[in-house]
Structures are given as structure tokens and as C-alpha cells.
Amino acid sequence: MPKSPGRKSNPAPGAYRPHVAARRPGGRHAIRPAFRVLVHHKYLAVWNELPDRVGLANAQQFWDHVAMTPGQPPKVGTSSIMKGKHNVPKWPGYSKTIHYEITGAARIDYQYNRTATEGTHGDPHGVVKIMSIDLGSH
């Protein structure tokens, strides 16, 4: 199959990775995160818009929570484990879906794995995958 103009090469089989790094709003944290925070690429634009919608401090508090202690109740905001078909782990080794509410202005669903071996090196590390972001009101 010929390559498209401007395309460098065809992707390798299995190279599709839908999650990308969700950078901390406002810049890096002084403390190295315990978990790598990833967001599905279809929510990346919404993730980047989050500080403008909920405030920089609220967006940073969410990121700090999931990057450090995703399985514990947050210090600010509320979280709950979802019920029904949406709570089932989407990937082997991941938690049930956690629903985090930021000041009533946004809801973010995520799952985490303390010892994920995904990635190029295959070394165990903590990963949080943001599955959905809703900036609408209830």
C-alpha cells in the first residue's frame, strides 16, 4: 500500500496508543508524582481547557490527587466509586471507575493501576487513565 503524501511511515502493528500524558495544569509539581496521569486523546482538548473552566487551583488539586493518591478520598472535592456497568475495570489490573467531582463544574472518571507494565520499557509503575471529562452541569 503506498504511503500518503507527508506521512513518514506506516505505524507498526499494535502501535495505536489512545492515551497521552495529561500534563499538570500550570506546570510541574515540586514533588515527583507517584502515578503517571494519562488522558484519552479525544479528551485532550477538554483537559487543556479545564483550568479555564474550573480554575487553575481546582485543576491542579485534581491532578495532584490522581498523581499522588488516586485510591484515597480527595482532600478537596468529592469522589465515589461508580456503580453498575461503568464501575468494571476496563483493563486488567486497574481499579473500578472512580467519579471525581470538581466544585460542581466538572466531573472526571478515571481508573488507576499501582503496578502497570504498559509502555516501551515494561517496568512496573503507577498509572492513572482519565476515561472521561464532563464540563457540563448535572
Regions from the PLM with identified roles:
Residues 1-106, 113-138:
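Basic, Lys/Arg-enriched alpha-helical interface segments
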